[in-house]
Structures are given as structure tokens and as C-alpha cells.
């Protein structure tokens, strides 16, 4: 009984729900900012989420085809305002790699049409299962210095893509790009 009474007044949480309750109380008493509280909640929540929960689905992907000429794909790249693009072969399940928009700058800056080789420009695509937990994925992004991963289902078919920005937005909220 003495231990129970001591625990009652110790002020230390014994589990995550108690911790969240204490943090909520601290925010209500203005000891921490609401934005900080939301980030803490987000950071704790990412370990419960999976790549499938936040990925850009297959149907919404903006891709470049391996055999396309720059004149054919540049308008799409510019209009989309994305910085990375999956490069496909025959279909969306045949991902050859990732094309970075910054690697296309010489094509945009030179009206004469700089020499471009898709094969030399694409980078290997990181591949993750739909079930990958976001906290693990974030660590892999950091460790491998990747910003985008191809998400595949249990049959190895493309489900979508997920970016480091998608994961970070789960922690800090919406990130507005210019």
C-alpha cells in the first residue's frame, strides 16, 4: 500500500498514455507551447504508422518513362514542381530508378538541348514494404541519405512512393514548399 501511495504522488508517468496526459496538462498550464506538444505527439505517433499510411499512391504518381526524350517529359516535370521522379520501364511495376529534377537543369538552361542520357542520370531507388514503420523509415532515410523510397506490396508491385518530407510532416505538421 505504501508503494501505491508513493506512486500516486511521484509525478512520473508509467506508460505512454500517462506521459501524453502529463504533456497535455503542461500545455494547458502554458508550461510548453501547443506547437511543441503537437510535435511531441507526432514524434510518438510515427512509430505506430506505416509507409502505406502516408505514401503517395500509385494512381497519383508523376513518373518519367525510361525511353522518353527530354522534350517530352520536361513540361510534366516543370508543371509538377516535384524534385524527384520515379523512372519506369514498361509499366509502374518496372521502376528503373529515381530522376532528380536538379540533374535536368542543364537541359533547361541550354536552348540547344544538352546531351542527356537517362541511363546515366537515374539513381537507384530505395525500396520499402508497405508495412515499414515510419520511425524506422526516417532513420533509413537519414542513414542512407535518401529522400524518396518506392513502396511495394507483398507481391513486389508498386504501391506508391514515400518521401522524407511525408514522414517529417507527420511530426511537425504540413510543410509548405515555395
Regions found by a protein language model. Give the residues of each.
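Short, low-complexity N-terminal regulatory "tails/caps" that precede and couple sensory modules
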Residues: 1-13
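Soluble cytosolic regulatory domains appended to membrane proteins
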Residues: 11-178
Amino acid at each position: 500500500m505504501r508503494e501505491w501511495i508513493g506512486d500516486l504522488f511521484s509525478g512520473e508517468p508509467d506508460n505512454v498514455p500517462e506521459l501524453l496526459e502529463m504533456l497535455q496538462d503542461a500545455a494547458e498550464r502554458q508550461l510548453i507551447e501547443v506547437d511543441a506538444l503537437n510535435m511531441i505527439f507526432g514524434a510518438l505517433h510515427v512509430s505506430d504508422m506505416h509507409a502505406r499510411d502516408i505514401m503517395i499512391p500509385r494512381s497519383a504518381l508523376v513518373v518519367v518513362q525510361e525511353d522518353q526524350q527530354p522534350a517530352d517529359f520536361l513540361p510534366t516535370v516543370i508543371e509538377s514542381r516535384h524534385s524527384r521522379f520515379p523512372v519506369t520501364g514498361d509499366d509502374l511495376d518496372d521502376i528503373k530508378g529515381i530522376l532528380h529534377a536538379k540533374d535536368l537543369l542543364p537541359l533547361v538552361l541550354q536552348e540547344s538541348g544538352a546531351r542527356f542520357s537517362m541511363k546515366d542520370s537515374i539513381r537507384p531507388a530505395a525500396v520499402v514494404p508497405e508495412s515499414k514503420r515510419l520511425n524506422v523509415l526516417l532513420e533509413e532515410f537519414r542513414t542512407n541519405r535518401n529522400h524518396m523510397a518506392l513502396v511495394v506490396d507483398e507481391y513486389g508491385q508498386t504501391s506508391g512512393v514515400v518521401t522524407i518530407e511525408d514522414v517529417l510532416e507527420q511530426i511537425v505538421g504540413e510543410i509548405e514548399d515555395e
